[in-house]
Amino acid sequence: MQGASLMSPKPPLVLVHGLWDTPNVFRRLRQHLEDWPAPILAPHLPHKLGFTPLKTLAQDLELAIDEAFGPDQTIDLLGFSMGAVISRTWLQLYGGHRRTRRFVSLGSPQNGTLVHSIRYF
């Protein structure tokens, strides 16, 4: 976490990495946001090579946000790739929409992927 105190006029910014990524994917972005006037959180959400269920990752995201900022703090949320799908799942299924001011989805497969439509015999 970095940035100003929780009393900042801007809510904390939460960055959610994608599948086969870690919070390190946001390293350069965080360098550009060094003077950002609010805390920044980029939690690590282990996916176990893609076998961790999406709902579990969304619950892990909620735990990380609650641990960092408490359950009532409004946040801004940026999800990259599968991280945006995890974020959307948290917003829609776990009440994240009640505390999220803005949600930004970057490069995400919100409509699924080609691999998802392949049938296994």
Residue ranges of predicted features:
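Proline/glycine-enriched tight loop/beta-turn segments at coil->beta junctions
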Residues: L6-P12
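Short amphipathic alpha-helix
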Residues: R28-L29
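Serine-dependent carboxylesterase/thioesterase catalytic core
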Residues: L13-L19, P23-N24, L33-E34, P39-F51, ...
